[in-house]
């Protein structure tokens, strides 16, 4: 009996020590979790049914399993993404304990209170995005200690006081503090010298200093008699010269109006380098050298907006140079610069970052980073022999990434950007096959003399929404339609419009062909043969459901891109599809009961591996 009691006591002691060890481990390893728990306790959700903080369980050893939190391989928090999450409350000073944090994204919520000084302790921070909240108080001077900070958006809040001079020592690439209550002088030194008034608009700040006026010569005295005679003679000579010059001027004007494939250097292009915010203004000579005089061997693609050339800058970096073709109008240069800067302010992991531009009296050129893996279209249909096909996991990730990029354009840009030509050819892939939406903003840029929503229809056959084609009026739902067709390209590997399908008596429009195949319940015949059967049938079914929801004939019935993102993340696709089935069954005979797999969590597996690759809104 005594032996039995001894064993029981030993077991109890062991369990006690084990619990004590676990508690000690949790306390030691969960300092970051405690900081995030403080943030959770300070915030509340305006949508309790979809509370994004619901998974933030303080009893877990690490916060790395929480949704919207990303960790590095050492289980240190590197990203907190709570943008557009319907949260209210205040930020907490404990955030300063996240010493490995690189991205803090809290845009488009209803956060109040002040920005904690302790954020200045986040020495690894690259991006701080607090856009569109109700934050008040000053901009903390401690942010000047953030040597790695490159992206700072504090616009559309109620911040007051002066801009701290300490920020001028930070090498910012993107800055937006517009639409606040700031006062005082705008710093002009450091990185602030690169930013234009658009970054500071709608405050009570002192205007940027104007350049010194050009010196003027004193008024000359009235001419004497001899001078008058010389002036008359000079006038006669000038008139004669003008008589001969007029035909030459007319000929030059005619040449300029003709579309040319040649580039001419003019003195205006040798002006001192001009920066628009983080954009560089390249000289035409730089881009001629980079692209080998725009050699045809460097052409990456051709589209409705012009040709794209591969180039290598003097510093060795590869770029893609887009030569725009458009009709210039009076005053267009200033408007072009304004629109270019607005495009450059759209910064997101899934958007192609504009690096710079070149503007001359005859040319408009945009410079982008070079995307190593080309476009989705080229990977699907034009891949070099020996290169592997896009596997199914990559295609799923492309669907989600491109949706996030489009949602950002629609919901999080200060001026909503409608793409108007969403297709596989405009979804680019970086070195890691992350989807990057390209060519956004160009439709507006090329119509900068048009102040109305209705413009010439731009787009690609097979991707154009019916209401856009019939009325010329585009909206964000136009992009949703194009996105839905792009999903079908990902699934089938086929073009949106292909006359070759006539050989099999099939519809030339991909969307119509898919609907016909689905009526015959031949799902397997839809899937790209390049996948060689290596896909999950339930996942294909769900992506088709999403595509059909996005391509409904009625624009009002299509989901918003933000809703598409949520459904791809596993929230509401089954319900939305079932509702659509009840309404559209007579028209679209894709029987949901024939494909009974209802789960949607395939698109966001709840594992650290995918969370670590999730970069919702940082600069590229």
From Swiss-Prot:
It is found in: Cell membrane. LRR repeats lie at residues 100-122, 124-146, 148-170, 171-193, 194-215. Residues 294-591 form the Protein kinase domain. The keyword Ligase does not apply. GO terms for cellular component: mitochondrion; plasma membrane. Disruption phenotype: No visible phenotype; due to the redundancy with BAK1. Compromised SCOOP10- and SCOOP12-induced root growth inhibition and reactive oxygen species (ROS) production in the double mutant bak1-5 serk4. Bak1 and bkk1 double mutants are seedling lethal. One of its GO terms (biological process) is leaf senescence. The chain crosses the membrane at residues 235-255. It is a single-pass type I membrane protein. It comes from the Eukaryota. ATP binds at residues 300-308, 322. The keyword NAD does not apply. Residues 256-620 are cytoplasmic. Residues 205-227 are annotated as: Disordered. GO terms for molecular function: ATP binding; protein serine kinase activity; receptor serine/threonine kinase binding; signaling receptor binding; transmembrane receptor protein serine/threonine kinase activity; transmembrane receptor protein tyrosine kinase activity. Its EC number is 2.7.10.1, 2.7.11.1. Keywords: ATP-binding, Cell membrane, Glycoprotein, Kinase, Leucine-rich repeat, Membrane, Nucleotide-binding, Phosphoprotein, Receptor, Repeat, Serine/threonine-protein kinase, Signal, Transferase, Transmembrane, Transmembrane helix, Tyrosine-protein kinase. PANTHER family: SOMATIC EMBRYOGENESIS RECEPTOR KINASE 1 (PTHR47988). Dual specificity kinase acting on both serine/threonine- and tyrosine-containing substrates. Positively regulates the BR-dependent plant growth pathway and negatively regulates the BR-independent cell-death pathway. Required during SCOOP small peptides (e.g. SCOOP10 and SCOOP12) perception and signaling; associates with MIK2 as a coreceptor upon MIK2 perception of SCOOP peptides, and relays the signaling through the activation of receptor-like cytosolic kinases (RLCKs) BIK1 and PBL1. This is Somatic embryogenesis receptor kinase 4. It comes from Arabidopsis thaliana. The gene is SERK4.
